[in-house]
């Protein structure tokens, strides 16, 4: 007999991907832990100053005779949208997936001078 037959099941909508963001004068670094997400399911797109990250976490195969008694992990599609500042080099953004399955997105900042003198022509 099943011991935990009356535990409530957990349901969720498509969750956001948690991330950390760091900044220096030269760049912005975004770090996302993506355990269980395969590289071929990841997509990064930029549109209207927004970085959109999507992926999918696939449930490992479980023997047919096993019945779920607790479900805390989310399996399925993931999505996150991050607003980007306009003062960056959009064409130089790059990313890498580490062996620990952490996505790192490096966003170089454009140099914006504090003060510009504009000559007046005659």
How should these model regions be labeled?
Residues 1-122:
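Alpha-crystallin/small heat shock protein
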């Amino acid at each position: 007999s099943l011991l935990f037959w009356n535990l409530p099941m957990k349901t969720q909508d498509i969750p956001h991907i948690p991330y950390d963001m760091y900044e220096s004068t030269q760049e912005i670094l975004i770090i996302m832990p993506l355990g269980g997400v395969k590289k071929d399911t990841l997509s990064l797109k930029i549109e209207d100053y927004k970085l959109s990250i999507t992926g999918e976490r696939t449930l490992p195969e479980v023997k047919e005779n096993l019945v779920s008694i607790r479900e805390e992990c989310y399996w399925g599609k993931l999505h996150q949208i991050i607003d980007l500042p306009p003062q960056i080099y959009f064409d130089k953004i790059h990313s890498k997936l580490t062996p620990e399955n952490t996505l790192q997105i490096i966003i170089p900042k454009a140099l914006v001078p504090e003060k510009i003198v504009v000559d007046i022509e005659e």
